[in-house]
């Protein structure tokens, strides 16, 4: 399964997302957004592209905070995936989000605006970075691989 991952889009409308992101998301099986859409129009636009799983971020509108969960747990191709926005300083954020989930194979998060694609203690920590600068593609099958795509 091919998953498009983004976070921290920080735009007020869907049409402000980078064209390269939109082209890539047209070719995935699932879209995951790790929060800080800012505007509901971005959420609605992503839903038009395909199946979307999303969590809320600290900068999201009150409307989004009411309809999106703080965290999400999925199982895809036998792999458990935790999704959360994150909080606090970029330093140590992977440890903080790592403490939220147990028994997962992948943790997808955002907030720091710094991308990460690193395995620690058998868990892939995947942060696509701020969507104005980068996004990610996760491929899940017999193996799991992540790629950060710079804009």
Regions found by a protein language model. Name each.
Residues 74-107:
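Mid-chain, well-packed structural core segment of small domains
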Residues 50-53, 68-72, 122-126:
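Active-site regions of enzymes building and remodeling cell-envelope glycoconjugates
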Residues 19-20, 47, 69, 90, ...:
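Generic secondary-structure boundary signal with a strong preference for alpha-helix termini
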Residues 11-14, 37-42, 59-65, 88-93, ...:
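Active-site environment of divalent metal-dependent phosphoester hydrolases
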Residues 1-50, 60-69, 78, 151:
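N-terminal active-site segment of His-dependent metallophosphoesterases
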Residues 6, 76-77, 99-103, 120-121, ...:
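Binuclear metal-dependent phosphoesterase catalytic core
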Residues 5-7, 30-36, 53-58, 83-85, ...:
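Active-site neighborhood of phospho(di)ester-bond hydrolases with catalytic His/Asp-centered motifs
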Residues 22, 44, 71-73, 98-99, ...:
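Short secondary-structure boundary/capping segments
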């Amino acid at each position: 399964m091919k998953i498009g991952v983004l976070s921290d889009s920080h735009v007020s409308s869907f049409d402000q997302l980078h064209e390269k992101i939109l082209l890539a998301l047209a070719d995935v099986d699932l879209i995951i957004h790790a929060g800080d859409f800012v505007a509901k129009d971005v959420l609605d636009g992503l839903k038009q592209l395909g199946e979307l799983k999303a969590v809320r971020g600290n900068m999201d509108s009150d409307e989004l905070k009411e309809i999106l969960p703080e965290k999400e747990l999925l199982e895809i191709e036998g792999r458990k995936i935790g999704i959360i926005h994150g909080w606090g300083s970029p330093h140590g954020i992977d440890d903080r989000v790592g403490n939220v989930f147990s028994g997962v194979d992948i943790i997808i998060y955002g907030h720091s605006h710094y991308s990460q694609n690193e395995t620690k203690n058998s868990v892939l920590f995947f942060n696509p970075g701020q969507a104005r600068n980068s996004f990610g593609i996760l491929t899940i099958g017999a193996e799991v691989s992540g790629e950060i795509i710079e804009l």
